[in-house]
């Protein structure tokens, strides 16, 4: 009997929105799925309970990466870092400091630290490796009322470009890419649409897009993201979903 391929998949924020859609559309049978989130509850997934806005939770994720990878010889290992938050929306000089700090820790610091942990856990491993960072069009365009979110996504894109250069010197190395998923019909998008146009002017455009049915379905976007694993993309690529559909 031919043994089954061992496939390990981690998705941060798999309990809702795009993360839940990614978990529901995994294109592999018998994959070991791990949901990194506060709530958990993702069907078919094991759960690492982690509030990624709290740095004390990051070592828990690092430990899980290492234990699962070292427990066997995986042929394919994937980490999709999707977790993020818009809260607090509003001008940087007016929003709550505690919420703003959590935003920076989750959107900026956690992404880079967990990316590092994943790469470190795989260092020297002879298997197919993919790290996908979910970015945003906000990385390229400033949106009033979303300063820390915009800065975080821009930082993630530059991190991917830089780490991609580093991974080209590794054999086999990890393919590291960033993808902006576009405007999706999720609870996070609803939060943005519900914000005041005085504080977040772009919210009006998204309300119009919803009225016109122009917001993408999470499942469709998720399937496109999964298709990136089979595409001939260079490590360090920074993409928009419209460029690959």
Spans of model-derived segments:
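C-terminal helical subdomain
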Residues: 178, 186, 197-245
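Active-site helix of classical SDR
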Residues: 115, 152
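Rossmann-fold cofactor-recognition segment
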Residues: 43-56
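Conserved glycine-rich Rossmann-like NAD(P)H-binding loop of the short-chain dehydrogenase/reductase
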Residues: 27-43
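Residue(s) in the substrate-gating loop at a strand-loop-helix junction
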Residues: 136
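Conserved mid-core segment of classical short-chain dehydrogenase/reductases
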Residues: 75, 85-101, 120, 145
